[in-house]
């Protein structure tokens, strides 16, 4: 069966929620029994977001196969069952890199390389490749219509729509319909101008998703339909909602999934949203609440920890609790002391890079260990917990990571120079390797030790979790730390790399080298986060 395409663009302003809208529509189509995937096309020139500042771009989401991608792919995986891969996200930088590589290799036989056709052909080829095998592929274009950067992507999609046939393509455009309090009405003119901008490059939208803080009246929807040349039933009002997980039902109530299926002549059962109804019920009917302190380096932009934030909320759903997240800059722990950690039910230290704020994370781990506060450390949060234990329990006063201090007496964390990837191939790195694309990335197997909290939570011996790091526990110094009581409860498949540590005689102190947040979903949660939030609730009873 041929793949059908839905191209999602945005207009008027950025940050309207194209990714959430695309994921919600995908969830609806999946609930009708269709096989759906989503792709994100990013117009920036970086090859991938792997080396971009978290405070500028937000979180880097890691896929099962090790791609460092846009955080929207996290939304996609939280809404649908399809796992994202390297094929689901590419940038202008990646496209140009590939075209230039082919030119140097002589693939173009001496032709003059141009945006059209060479860049647009490469974009089309990647979209077709990523969409192969699915009933519907939803392709989101980053940025706003009118941006210079996104023009090659839009031109490529215009051409693709012509080539595969308009009966197999839908252009879905998100716009802002602002409410003007002084006039007491919503204004449709920005939407009309945004559609005019699309028309100027040869694209007629088939569906308009109109973002507003309220439902758009029927008469205004009729006006938008008339002046934008779109059927009235394809003008969808998408108001602000309390939970993003309400959006699939909101789109369904206006018949968007039915419109798509009719357009593509797809037969399917009515969308079964019972799982989403259960999510919303648990969200609306909590039996208690907990406050989790997230001690990080990039807390000025919560999106830098988007998947962690969502995983905590999912754990709240699992435990029927409302989770309040208190963001604490790890540098504040250094300058103001551990008083900033008081009145927390649990403490989570997420990943990060660089020495800034690390001593604050180490102090945080010490505070949680000594005061019996439930602690979950992720990536750097595990490494700082191990450094703290080495310094204050194992007597290794100068313990540190070679990432931060090159010549410390006890480099308990060191650069991984060799590891085995998921296929069993050995990868090697040195301190001179490029920063981009050189980490231990993607899903790796982990062996859990019998009798550990981790084994109890997961309920099985072997798990698979996603990684993004280039430093690991130094095995030569590990015996000294274990002799002081620290338990290693998770190891890599070849038993060479430490994956999970636990502090014994503590209510709940678990830290992992991998990133469990990337596989947490609202429907299924994640065992580590669920166990952590449950322990935080039990901590209130003390």
Swiss-Prot record:
Protein activity control: Allosterically activated by GTP, when glutamine is the substrate; GTP has no effect on the reaction when ammonia is the substrate. The allosteric effector GTP functions by stabilizing the protein conformation that binds the tetrahedral intermediate(s) formed during glutamine hydrolysis. Inhibited by the product CTP, via allosteric rather than competitive inhibition.
Boundaries of every Glutamine amidotransferase type-1 domain copy: 291-542
Protein name per UniProt: CTP synthase
GO biological process: 'de novo' CTP biosynthetic process; pyrimidine nucleobase biosynthetic process
EC number: 6.3.4.2
Gene that produces this protein: pyrG
Protein source organism: Actinobacillus succinogenes (strain ATCC 55618 / DSM 22257 / CCUG 43843 / 130Z)
Functional summary from the UniProt entry: Catalyzes the ATP-dependent amination of UTP to CTP with either L-glutamine or ammonia as the source of nitrogen. Regulates intracellular CTP levels through interactions with the four ribonucleotide triphosphates.
Family: Belongs to the CTP synthase family.
């Amino acid at each position: 069966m041929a793949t059908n395409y839905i191209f999602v663009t945005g207009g008027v302003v950025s940050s309207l929620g194209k990714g959430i809208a695309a994921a919600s529509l995908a969830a609806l189509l999946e609930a009708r029994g269709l096989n759906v995937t989503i792709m994100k096309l990013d117009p920036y020139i970086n090859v991938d977001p792997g080396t971009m500042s978290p405070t500028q771009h937000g979180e880097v989401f890691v896929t099962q196969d090790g791609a460092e991608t846009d955080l929207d792919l996290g939304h996609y995986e939280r809404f649908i069952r399809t796992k994202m891969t390297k094929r689901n996200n590419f940038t202008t930088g990646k496209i140009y890199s590939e075209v230039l590589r082919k030119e140097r290799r002589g693939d173009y036989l001496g032709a003059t390389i141009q945006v059209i056709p060479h860049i647009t052909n490469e974009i089309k080829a990647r979209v077709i490749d990523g969409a192969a095998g699915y009933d519907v592929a939803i392709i989101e274009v980053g940025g706003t219509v009118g941006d210079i950067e996104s023009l090659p992507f839009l031109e490529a999609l215009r051409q693709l729509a012509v080539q595969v046939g308009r009966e197999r393509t839908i252009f879905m455009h998100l716009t802002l319909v602002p409410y003007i309090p002084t006039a007491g009405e919503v204004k449709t003119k920005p939407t009309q101008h945004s559609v005019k901008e699309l028309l100027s490059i040869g694209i007629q939208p088939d569906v308009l998703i109109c973002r507003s803080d309220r439902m758009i009246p029927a008469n205004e929807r009729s006006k938008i339909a008339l002046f934008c040349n779109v059927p009235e039933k394809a003008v969808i009002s998408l108001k602000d909602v309390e939970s993003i997980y309400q959006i699939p039902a909101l789109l369904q109530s206006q018949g968007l999934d039915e419109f798509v299926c009719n357009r593509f002549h797809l037969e399917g059962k009515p969308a079964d949203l019972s799982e989403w109804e259960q999510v919303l019920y648990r969200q609306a009917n909590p039996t208690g609440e907990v406050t989790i302190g997230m001690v990080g380096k990039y807390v000025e932009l919560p999106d830098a920890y988007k998947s962690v934030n969502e995983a905590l909320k999912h754990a709240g759903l699992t435990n029927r609790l409302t989770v309040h997240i208190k963001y604490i800059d790890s540098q504040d722990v250094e300058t103001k002391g551990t008083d900033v950690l008081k009145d927390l039910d649990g403490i989570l230290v997420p990943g990060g890079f660089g020495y800034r704020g690390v001593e604050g994370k180490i102090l945080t781990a010490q505070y949680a260990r000594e005061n019996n506060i439930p602690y979950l450390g992720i990536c750097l949060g595990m490494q700082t917990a191990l450094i703290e234990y080495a310094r204050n329990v194992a007597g290794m006063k100068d313990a540190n990571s070679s990432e931060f201090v090159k010549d410390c007496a006890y480099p308990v964390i060191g650069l991984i120079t060799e590891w085995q990837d998921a296929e069993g191939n050995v990868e090697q790195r040195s301190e001179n390797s490029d920063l981009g694309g050189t980490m231990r990335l993607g899903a790796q197997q982990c062996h859990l030790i019998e009798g550990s909290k981790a084994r109890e939570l997961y309920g099985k011996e072997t798990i698979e979790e996603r990684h993004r790091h280039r430093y690991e526990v130094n095995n030569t110094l590990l015996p000294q730390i274990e002799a002081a009581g620290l338990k290693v409860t998770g190891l890599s498949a070849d038993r060479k790399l430490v994956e999970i540590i636990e502090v014994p005689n503590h209510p709940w102190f678990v830290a992992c080298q991998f990133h469990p947040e990337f596989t947490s979903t609202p429907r299924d949660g994640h065992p580590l986060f669920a166990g952590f939030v449950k322990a935080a609730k039990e901590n209130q009873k003390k």
